[in-house]
Design a protein with these regions (language model features):
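Basic/polar N-terminal segments that are highly enriched at the extreme N-terminus
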Residues: 1-5, 208-211
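N-terminal ordered "arm"
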Residues: 2-48
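Generic structural motif
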Residues: 21-23, 44-48, 82, 132, ...
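Short, surface-exposed loop and linker segments with low hydrophobicity and enrichment for Pro/Ser/Thr
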Residues: 25-34, 66-71, 120-139, 182-184, ...
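Short acidic, gly/pro-rich beta-turn/loop elements at beta-sheet edges
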Residues: 28, 49-51, 87, 148, ...
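Aromatic- and glycine-enriched beta-alpha-beta binding-site module
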Residues: 33-104
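Charged linear interaction tracts used for macromolecular binding and regulation
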Residues: 73, 77-160
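Extended, charged low-complexity segments
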Residues: 151-211
């Protein structure tokens, strides 16, 4: 039984090591057989019980040796340094998949695939995202630095717009697809260049996507 109700409504930017289409979005295997990803999110409105989460940001860095569903992954979470102690605890419970119906959110699903969760990092997060424009910037000094851009037509150079519609998903219902570059430091190190990126509006609660 879930004792605490929560909800977050905001925008995300995700960059992983797959090619532009990311087979994982279609229950395929990752492009290179393993997964590396960084996700940033800003909560426009949110709460965990009576604790307000409006305006806070967080970042999650992931690494799996194979496909996500095969497990053995590790993660590092960065929480907005502006959050109070109570807000930090609330965000970590949500991000770590607690207080959630099993399998209902990406946080809960991903948590079930991890064998190592590094100590949380509390730091300033520079995060800007334009979902419709497929533009993003995500910087946590010493931890991660990345950006997102539209895919370009190889012949004309014009922006190429593609979306993924996932009505029964556990993260988003509609995502704009682009490309991204990321370099991470800290406990999980890797570099991505011109790989899959998604930009989406997120509205989740303890029971999954809010529709």
């Amino acid at each position: 039984m879930i004792d605490t109700n929560w909800a977050i409504h905001g925008r995300e930017f995700v960059n992983c090591n797959c090619s532009y289409g990311c087979p994982c979005q279609f229950n395929g295997l990752p492009t290179h057989g393993h997964c590396r990803a960084v996700a940033g999110m800003e909560i426009e409105q949110g709460h965990h019980g009576a604790t307000k989460l409006d305006g806070l940001k967080f970042v999650a860095i992931f690494r799996w040796p194979g496909a996500i569903h095969e497990g053995k992954g590790e993660a590092a979470v960065v929480v907005d340094e502006r959050a109070t102690e109570v807000q930090r605890g609330a965000l970590l419970r949500i991000i770590c998949g607690q207080d959630t119906k099993p399998g209902a959110t990406i946080f809960n699903v991903f948590a079930s695939t991890l064998e190592k969760l590094h100590d949380p990092i509390f730091a300033p997060i520079d995060f800007q995202v334009d979902v419709a424009g497929r533009q993003a910037r995500l910087v946590v000094p010493g931890v991660t630095e990345g950006r997102g851009e539209p895919i370009l037509n190889p012949v004309t150079g014009a922006p190429h717009r593609v979306r993924i519609d996932m009505p029964d998903g556990f993260e988003y219902t509609l995502a704009e697809i682009g490309r991204g570059w990321t370099k991470t430091g800290g406990p999980i190190k890797f570099e991505l260049a011109d790989t899959y990126a998604q930009f989406a509006e997120i509205h989740l609660c303890q029971n999954g996507i809010v529709r």
